[in-house]
Amino acid sequence: MRSKFLFLCLFLFGMLTACKNTKWVDVPTGTPPEGSVTGKPGETEEPDDPDPTDKTFINCSYIRGDFFETNRISGASMGACNDLIYLTARPYADGDLTFDLPVNDATLTGAATYAASYNGRNGVLKLDGTGKMNAGDGLLHSPDGAFKKFTFGTYIYVSEWVDGACLFKKVDDGSVVIAFQLGATEGNLKLTVGSATATVTNSALKSGAWHYVAVTYDGGAAKLYIDTNNTATDFTGSLPASVPNTRADFVMGENLKGYLDETFVNSLLMGTLGRNPISFDNWNNTKTLAYWKYDDAAKPGKDSHTWAIRLEQIRTALNGQAGDRKIRLGIAGGEWLKMVGNATARTNFANNVKKVIEQYNLDGADLDFEWAYSGTDLANYSKAIVQLREVLGKDVFLTVSLHPVSYKISAEAIAAVDFISLQCYGPSVKLFSMERFKSDGKAAVDYGIPQDKLVMGVPFYGTTGTAGEQAAYFDLVGKGNLTNTSADTWSYEGKNYTLNSQNTIRQKTQYVCENGFGGIM
């Protein structure tokens, strides 16, 4: 079924690239029309005279890292695009950036050291009570809101039980944000969230042996998992419904005497699922926010699951794909509305975006801030766009993604970007039709967005029209047995979904090609 989806996906992407630098033509039989490519394979074609007004037709796509890791996005489908946006970053109100998978490479201090092996496990972290490991401030907080659930898991060998020794903690200006510590007696553990502490005792947890230990936190309910036992032990004590949303360093191993191995943080409830070495080919594991394997003697604190590692994997998947393409940083969500409303934050944001682009050799950035509705918000968003262009310079590719309900940025902002993508879809099924597609594009052009700068978005998913009820085209094909290339509605899991069929996307692409738009997304 996956091969069927890939075939359909490549068929669609092939159509999208068909009109690059030319007028759309359909030539099933007969003589090719004037202007089409003719000749035999291997014949030399006379080059056209360069046209300074010629623009490459944009075939753009977002990449979500979790979809890529679970093989929902192939190298071939990415290779069919000439512009790829890796959607991974989010801004804080002060203009700082965070990522869906932060780079949590940890620094070892004191006597925290790499050990090649210990008591049957290879590549481990050794702690003697005087050292610790600091993974920076990227974990258990978010510009999208406080964490209400997570799992922390690790293999641990306790050489000597020390009351208060930390498996991990976050402390801000002397106040505990969150801490997971050994308790007063062997087998006793305590979890502190803010000013509240809950405790648990499990006699299976003993010093002098390796154990898998995981704590899950779900809206204030904490559970402990030990070794292979899938039955959790509940913590006793009342905890708040979320972790204080404070940016503070994530520190492991302070005062701990023993060893750690295969330590991870996940945003879901994993229980014993992290007990084996983690691979990232299933949905739950893609939500692993940090993974320290301690198997690199030169960099024992290396985080093995980051957005930057995903970026390199995307680049590797594109090896051998024909043609040139841009890979750009996608920035969405977070506290963007607060950020654009503050001049100092806008400056910080622009400088941070530039730094990331340069550090990771990216081709530019895309802003997908949903949505500015008021005149003030649109004006502030426009200022952020203009300032970002000023900081990036003219040679870095910059775009914004807008929506038919929110596209009226300033003329200066329109001039500052290389193109504007218009998301002609949404939770409402009314946005999916060909007629609405045309009218939304016309409205944006009438407002003042140049037609050749407007990249029109099409949906590769279906919706029932109810918020939260969307299904990816991948699933409609793979699980819903969608085979009809003309069906704009389909029954899936007992509900009717509105989508764009292959034929509808073909028609929209043909319309974009024939009417001078900048591209398709």
Where are these regions (language model features)?
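Flexible glycan-contacting loops in extracellular carbohydrate-active proteins
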Residues: 234-259, 284-289
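Bacterial Sec-dependent N-terminal signal peptides
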Residues: 2, 10, 14-55
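Short hydrophobic/aromatic patches on beta-strands that form ligand-binding or substrate-lining surfaces
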Residues: 84-87, 99-101, 151-160, 168, ...
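Extracellular glycan-recognition modules
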Residues: 96, 100-102, 129-190, 267-274, ...
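Chitinase-like catalytic core of GlcNAc-active glycosidases
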Residues: 52-107, 111-115, 255, 301-436
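Extracellular glycan-interaction surfaces
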Residues: 107-131, 152-162, 179-241
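Extended recognition patches within non-cytosolic domains
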Residues: 96-99, 261-305
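Glycan-binding loop/region signatures in secreted carbohydrate-active enzymes
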Residues: 41, 52, 79-81, 95-97, ...
